[in-house]
Amino acid sequence: MSSMFKQISKSLFYEKATMSVLFFLSCLGSFMYFFVQVSIDGNLKHLAYNKTNGLLINSSQKELLIALHSNQILAATFLIIFSVIAAFAFYMFFLKYYRNHMKEIGCYKAFGRSNKQIIAVMFFINSSLSFIAFIVGFILGWICSDVLLQLYRSSFDIESLHKGILPSNLAIGFLFIVVLSGIMAIVPYYKFLKFDISSLLRNFPEEHQNKWIVFISNKLSNAVPTKYRRSFRIALRKPLAVSLLFLSVGCFTVLSIMSMSLHFSSQYIYETQTLGRSYKYDIQFENYQPYHPLEEDSTFYLRSNVKISWKGNEINQQAIGFHKKTNLFQFYTLDHKKLFLPKEKEVYINEALSELYGIRQNDYIEVNIKHKIYKLKVAAIVGNAENKTIYLSEPQLASMLSIKESSYNGILSNTVPKQYENKSIITEKERLAYLQKNNVSNKISAVINQLLGCIIGCLLLYLVILLNFQDCTRNILILNMLGYSANSINKMLISIYKPLLNVAFIIMVSLSVIVCQFIQKSLSIKTGDYIPFQTNLFIIGGIWLLLNLIYHLIHCRFNNNIAKIQNAGQTKKYIL
């Protein structure tokens, strides 16, 4: 048993590059999960302890509690996505590994080793590798969680924050990172259980090509240019390899588009939240104030919390009504056209309501104010609306609130009258600082996601293309011994993957955009923070260039490996 363990370990770690990629994927999944979860569990435990002992929780702690619950969803999302990607990579590698080492498997079985023993060894080796990655990721996540704690301190003005991890969450991470990876290492082996020892030793299991695969590959290859026809037919007769290529391109494209969208959305939010505003002070009152004349550089407004009902959704919003048209706050549509104040029985909504819930212009929505429901027409979608805010006419909002017309509880102004100096005042500087802080925070998150997206996408793509190339190693060496030139072999077996890669990109890019829109929409609804989807042709073009660059780098590396095999005189080892 020990000799088989040593031999399998040696053959596995001979693939240094691939095993390093698998280790890094497991480590990354563990790191991202614990990076978020460690900053959650300690604080949730602390807040729960305060509640149990009857201690009061202030407003900042309540906001922190909401953020922690939202981040729990984020941590679970990280764990699931990274675990699925890692499991996919492990499955691909070990499927190729078993195919390329059938003779060794046949030898183990010929010497009396059972399938259960082989599976146990494979599971143990792979789980051990994943366990080391799990521990490394946990330690790094614990250390780096200080970054999130610092963000909590700056966002919620709370100094007493704690790290921690619940045993249940530690066990969940272990199951997804370690156990799942071990299982995915042995799942491909079950395909080889049906082969007898003689078939394995001959290295040519008696598999019959599915007639439908042959038929489809022949039909599809006839549709491509003549110079690619033979190569295309050869590639399509390996449907799993082609499927994995398409899937990896899809994952790479989704991760890349998502990361770039997150980066640009933070700037988009900052720009829309500063557009059309030329006031310096926002003076707010707890109670409604009676009308009295204001300075020319001031205007008052009325605000109230409301609920919008739309297709079964109850959406909390803030309603604002301005007393008169003013240059202090100019409404703009999504295409940057100026808007006047809404009319009676009309409402202006923000972009988030339109994008997340599908409310369109001229639709009718139900607005619940003080337990009374009003049906209003959506007259426009305001591109520069305040977050979670809708706009009505001031007389209409006053009527809904059953207060006198021209009453107000807020003033926008460029000066602060002396009688209001002790009121709640949000200055332009404070407002811009808050937006900038959120912008920087969002950009940091976007850069992290961008780097992770590119790293994971590149690694996954690298793994798939390299494994497909390695699958051709034996055929390349045989053709070389038969006298075919390197250029001819390249055109026949390797170059076809470049057009396949580009076809996969063209097919998957539209689907990737839809997936990214769905993910960002779901995150926006779950967290309550609107994340507008942002992409353009330059981003798509950049992803395509990066995709082809990765292909050429892998191609060069593979050609160098083939040359090393030939120069070292190891051709027979790969053929026999």
What are these regions (language model features)?
Residues 65, 69-70, 102-209:
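Hydrophobic alpha-helical segments
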Residues 227-352, 361-363, 367-368:
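Juxtamembrane segments of multi-pass membrane proteins
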